[in-house]
Regions:
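Extended, highly charged clamp/arch subdomains and adjacent linkers
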Residues: 1-73, 92, 115-120, 124
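Phosphate- and other anionic-substrate recognition elements at nucleic-acid/protein interfaces
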Residues: 51-64, 70-73, 77, 82-209
Length: 209
């Protein structure tokens, strides 16, 4: 403000100098500064929007171009703490074969029981891949899957994969999901969707409204 005032005051000793300085200060604080702030904010917002769009586009491209996993029976897991982990097995065509709800994490901590259930489902349906949703409790569930695979009779024939569960809850509550799985609750439909996303990501993602 002082620098701007000096540019407007020809004679600092003039009796009008204080009034000119006051006018410059008022003009800056009331008019110029807010305008500059709005312009900078608009530029920053535009840059952030452009970066967000670029990041979203890149992530979406990677998601849509994921190669399908054909010919494998998959055990899909929708992780959770208090409400448990929903588990659904789908065959190579995406047909739901069976499932269960396990409670390996807090507060129930029924870890061994959960492992036994997973061992049983893998053996019963011949599933060779565990697809784990990457949301809440995913890291804890990843450790569970790793233990189950390590304890399996043929650990080399099993694997687990982290799968993006973005939009799974939207699909599971949709009319399409209800029509396809009228006998399954919402969370179990989500586990089916997670398993299918590994088998054919594009075919499953297009169902999200």
């Amino acid at each position: 403000v002082e620098w701007m005032a000096q540019g407007q005051i020809a004679n600092p000793r003039s009796s009008f100098a204080p009034q000119i300085r006051q006018a410059v200060e008022d003009g800056y604080r009331r008019l110029l500064a807010p305008s500059i702030e709005r312009e900078l904010r608009a530029e920053s917002t535009a840059a952030c929007d452009e970066h967000a769009i670029s990041t979203f586009s890149r992530n979406l491209r990677q998601l849509l171009l994921q190669p399908p996993l054909k010919g494998r029976t998959v055990l899909g897991v929708d992780p959770g703490f208090r409400t448990g982990c929903k588990v659904a097995v789908v065959d190579a065509t995406g047909k739901h074969l069976g499932g269960a709800t396990i409670y390996p994490h807090e507060p129930q901590r029924r870890w061994d029981e959960a492992k036994a259930t997973l061992h049983g489902l893998l053996a019963e349906h011949g599933a060779t891949v565990i697809a784990i949703g990457n949301g809440t409790a995913s890291r804890e569930t990843e450790r569970l899957a790793a233990e189950v695979i390590a304890e399996a009779a043929d650990p080399q024939g099993l694997a687990y994969v982290m799968v993006s569960e973005a939009g799974a809850s939207v699909y599971s509550a949709s009319e399409l999901a209800r029509a396809e799985f009228p006998d399954l609750d919402v969370s179990m439909r989500g586990a089916v969707s997670i398993g299918r996303r590994l088998q054919d990501p594009l075919a499953e993602l297009v169902k999200i409204d």
